[in-house]
């Protein structure tokens, strides 16, 4: 089914190269290499799919442009995340901050966000502007919440859900709702598309956190348990702490890697923890499906 969107996704990538082009050739090359490195393009696909709720053909140019904007937001936020996390690789590729330094990477991220603001100003729809402003604000708050929550054993499930809402779900919701708005979809379909994107985004992030323990390093392009190594307490770790609090007695900023690996092994080999994580993800996926049914 998704094969039919391959050509449209390619059009989005080509559009990104056009609107991000600058007088600085190094910047152009870096951006082209970064966007060409692959990726699932989940947000682009979801925007394109939801744009079918209205008149896609008569709004194709604006839909492609909004898909470009969404992908640029996602990419810029990843670049800034990598700087904050001091990450050296992302999905098997070297990060910009590792290759070129924090200053250059920060400027690339800022440049991309400036492109977003320039391009979205061409859209007259006030709801697009409102949704975008809220999305960017929530992305920043989500990053602050994650930073404050590192190694925090007082983190509750509710705290985790609030964090992933801001870090992941809110941008996916913006992708789905902007696709439906720009295509001229009916109000009830616009509202449904936002709920669909939000719940799907929650499910998506929980699955990603599940795969951080259950997936393989080769398939994910990163080491197993990397979030926990970085002090980030995700849902599988929260469930593990509820089941075995003693395991986390030494979990603080001074804990060594060996002790972290003990926790990681406990989680990845505990079927109950992984199954409960999947179950919670499925609940959000069910809500996403029900949003469409409505």
Pin down the residues of each PLM region.
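All-alpha prenyltransferase/terpene-synthase fold signal
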Residues: 1-294
């Amino acid at each position: 089914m998704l094969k039919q969107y391959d050509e449209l996704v390619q059009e989005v990538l080509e559009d990104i190269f056009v609107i991000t082009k600058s007088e600085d050739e190094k910047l152009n090359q870096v951006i082209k290499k970064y966007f060409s490195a692959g990726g699932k393009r989940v947000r682009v696909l979801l925007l394109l799919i939801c744009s079918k709720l209205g008149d896609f053909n008569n709004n194709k140019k604006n839909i492609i442009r909004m898909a470009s904007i969404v992908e640029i937001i996602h990419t810029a936020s990843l670049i800034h995340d990598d700087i904050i996390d001091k990450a050296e690789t992302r999905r098997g590729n070297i990060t910009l901050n590792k290759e070129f330094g924090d200053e250059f990477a920060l400027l690339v991220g800022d440049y991309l966000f400036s492109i977003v603001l320039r391009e979205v100003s061409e859209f007259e729809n006030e709801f697009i502007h409102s949704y975008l402003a809220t999305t960017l604000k929530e992305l920043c708050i989500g990053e602050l919440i994650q930073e404050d929550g590192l190694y925090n054993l007082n983190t509750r499930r509710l705290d985790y859900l609030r964090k992933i809402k801001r870090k992941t779900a809110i941008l996916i919701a913006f992708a789905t709702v902007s696709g439906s708005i720009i295509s001229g979809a009916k109000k009830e379909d616009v509202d449904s598309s936002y709920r669909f994107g939000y719940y799907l985004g929650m499910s998506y992030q929980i699955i990603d956190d599940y795969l951080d323990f259950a997936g393989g390093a080769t398939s994910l392009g990163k080491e197993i348990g990397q979030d926990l190594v970085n002090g980030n307490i995700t849902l599988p770790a929260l469930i593990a702490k509820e089941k075995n609090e003693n395991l986390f007695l030494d979990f603080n900023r001074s804990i060594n890697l060996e002790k972290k690996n003990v926790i990681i092994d406990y989680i990845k080999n505990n079927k109950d923890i992984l199954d409960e994580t999947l179950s919670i993800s499925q609940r959000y996926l069910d809500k996403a499906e029900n949003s469409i049914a409505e």
